[in-house]
Each structure stands twice: as C-alpha cells, then as structure tokens.
Regions:
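Cys/His-rich short segments
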Residues: 287-347
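Conserved catalytic cysteine-centered active-site region
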Residues: 24-72, 182-213
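Acidic, glycine-rich active-site loops and adjacent beta-strand->loop/helix elements
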Residues: 22-28, 54-58, 77-83, 105, ...
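Structural signature of cysteine-dependent C-C bond-forming condensing enzymes
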Residues: 11-17, 43-48, 70-74, 151, ...
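Conserved active-site "lid/cap" helical segment
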Residues: 1-18, 29, 85, 121-169, ...
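Condensing-enzyme catalytic core mediating Claisen C-C bond formation in acyl metabolism
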Residues: 1-2, 87-144, 148, 222, ...
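Long, charge-rich boundary regions
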Residues: 338-368
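Flexible, glycine-rich active-site loops centered on histidine and acidic residues
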Residues: 65, 71-99
Length: 368
C-alpha cells in the first residue's frame, strides 16, 4: 500500500487531507493500519485516517463513498491473502495494491455516477478463526449473483448518468472470465470491451484488484472515454467514470507493466512456501532473534524509521541520514531541515560483506 501510494503521489503538489485504506488482510486488528501508511508517507499529523475491511468490495465501496467528496483523499486498496499449498486458489490468487488520489481540480477522470447494492449472497468467505477462503460452486455464484444482482446495479448507475450500455468504452469487472463474459452478454454489450483482467499475469489481488485494473486502464486511456468499474462480493458496486483532456498529459509512474517487467521469478517451490510461512525451515542459530519490537524506542524514532526522514544541513546543504547534532560534512551545529530520503537513489560508498548473515530472501545484485 505504501509503495502504491508513493507512486501515486510522485511529483504531485497536492497533500491529501485523508487516507482511506481497504483490505481483507490487515496485519493489525487493533491498530490504525492507514495510520501506519500515513506515517510512512510523512503526511501531516492532522491527516484523517480510516480502515475499510470485511469485503472484497472494500476498495470499490470506499470509492463509492467518497463520490462527491470535496476533500483530497488518498484511496488505497491492498491485499495479501493466504492460500492452502496445492490448492486452486494458490494458482489463482495474487498479492497487490493500488492507489488513487481523489479530489477536485486537475483530475484525469470524473466520476459521473455510482450505485451500490448489498445482497448477502455468499460466494466465498473467511472467518476470523480460519486462515483460508472457502469458495462456493462457481456456476451457482455466476447465475445467482453475477447475472441477477449486478445487472440491476449497472442499469441504475447508467440511468443516473443518462447513458446507454453502448456508451461505455471499457468494462472493468473484477470476477472470473466466464462471469464477466456472461454479464456483458446479458447486458447486450460487446465482450471485446472488457478491460484486461490482469489475472493471467498477477492473479486475483482481492479488494485491490478492481482498482489495479482501473489504474492500468487509465494509463492507456484517451480523452472522453467512459469506463465502468464493477466490484462484486455480498452485493455489487458500480462506478461510472469519464476521462477528460488532462488524461493525455498525465504520466503514470511505476505502472503495472513496469512492475511486471521488473519482477523477480521464484522458481523454487520450497523457498516460496518458506517465504509465505507455510513451512518452518531450520535456518540455524543466526536466524534466532527477538521478534518483539521495542515500541517505546520505535515511537521516539518513528518518523526516521517509517518515513526515512533525514536532515539537510542549513550551511553546506548536505543531506544525511539519520539527522545528527553536528553535520557530517562541515561539522556545524546549526539545525538541520527535515527531508525524506525515501525513493531516492544513492551510491554505496563502502560495504562489509557478511556471508553468514541470516536472510530468507536476500536481494540479488543487478542493473536497475
């Protein structure tokens, strides 16, 4: 989520006044997860934070709720769902995050209509006491859910916008390929208008997936196109958007394609299972450590740790991390101005190689 947010805010002069983070796999049940993200982004302490969870529609539902909002909101959706080794879900699921900056002014696209319907049709679920999702039969979900609940939601959203189904240029549907094709067939729309589902490359990324598909579609959009985003899970969300003339001037930093081109392949299944903590491998004495964080010390140094805040010398302009009482370059004791080093590229001046240091998945050297 932090990585997606940094890509979204890169070269942006607008500072969000609120952060909304949606997920079905939050690491903390009693701690503000969006607050952790806000700290990592070095946002002001007055930034309003909110966690949205409990449904794969968490991302689209948050987008619906912020419709007509006047404040600048950083909307994030991130999921990292666990799967049972050897299961179908292990081959289908992916881990990912997406970020959108919502507000007024210089926008790339305008939300022209939204509709949301709650219907407790359980296509899959996971309780607080279980680790893996339990999914029901796909055909039943398609016929009772996708072909009965979603069409009415879509028609309502189109009526609000005074549009016909033929006006939609791309359908961004988070669902199986058969469900998406069957839905468009029932609506009388061309299945060629389905946006790239991305599932063949990155898998199904849970509540982040519809927003991932949206950002990927926007990166290739032209002026005046109509997009329809469909979220599904115990109901449905439909968002209609129209791109404006700013879309042609936009730059999408770190798009989905760029990340796919920079991927690292893990072709050792045992290593993969170890990275996902599905098997407990003995890594030796060097892997033993205290797993508890010294929270009082972390609180004192949280800005340096989370946002990687360093200091810039007021006298010689040297950027250094961490900040110190004396400048490492000129030795002055003048106050240093806070500056984040996150995202910067530096050169390694010297290093010590420790071949026996523990690491589950050590970084590999290579060209950037």
């Amino acid at each position: 989520a932090v990585e997606a947010a940094r890509n979204c805010l890169k070269n942006s002069t607008e500072v969000p006044t609120s952060v909304t983070l949606g997920s079905t796999t939050f690491p903390f049940a009693d701690r503000s997860n969006s607050g952790v993200v806000a700290d990592a982004l070095n946002l002001p302490l007055q930034t309003q934070t909110e966690d949205v969870f409990g449904s794969r529609r968490a991302g689209t539902s948050a987008l619906v709720r912020h419709f007509r909002g006047s404040s600048s909101t950083l909307l994030l959706a991130s999921d990292c769902r666990e799967t049972r080794p050897g299961s179908t879900q292990e081959m289908q699921y992916g881990h990912g995050a997406a970020s959108l900056l919502l507000g007024t002014g210089d926008t790339l696209a305008d939300i022209i209509s939204v509709e949301s319907v709650h219907e407790d049709l359980i296509d899959q679920y996971r309780t607080v006491e279980t680790k893996y999702d339990y999914a029901l039969e796909e055909r039943w979900v398609r016929e009772e859910g996708w072909l009965k609940i979603v069409p009415e939601t879509i028609k309502s959203a189109l009526n609000k916008a005074n549009l016909e189904i033929g006006h939609v240029d791309k359908f961004i549907v988070h669902g199986t390929a058969s469900a998406a094709r069957s839905l468009l067939k029932k609506l009388g729309a061309d299945s060629k208008k389905l946006a790239d589902s991305l599932q063949s490359n990155i898998g199904d990324c849970g509540c982040a997936h519809p927003l991932l598909m949206l950002t990927n579609t926007l990166a290739k959009a032209t002026t005046g196109q109509h997009f329809m985003v469909v979220g599904f899970g115990q109901g449905s969300d439909v968002i209609l958007l129209k791109t404006n003339d700013k879309i042609a001037q936009s730059k999408f930093y770190q798009s989905v394609d760029i990340h796919l081109n920079n991927k690292r392949v893990v072709d050792n299944y045992a290593l993969y299972l170890s990275l996902r903590n599905h098997i407990d491998i003995d890594f030796g004495l060097r892997s033993e450590r205290d797993n508890r964080t010294a929270l009082s010390a972390y609180y004192r140094k949280r800005r340096e740790i989370s946002a990687m805040l360093g200091g810039r010398c007021a006298k010689c302009n040297t950027l250094q991390f961490p900040r110190s009482l004396l400048c490492v370059s000129c030795g002055t004791d003048e106050p240093q101005e806070e500056e984040s080093l996150s995202g910067l590229i530096g050169r390694v001046k010297s290093f010590t190689e420790v071949r026996y240091e523990f690491g589950k998945s050590k970084p590999k050297a290579g060209k950037r």
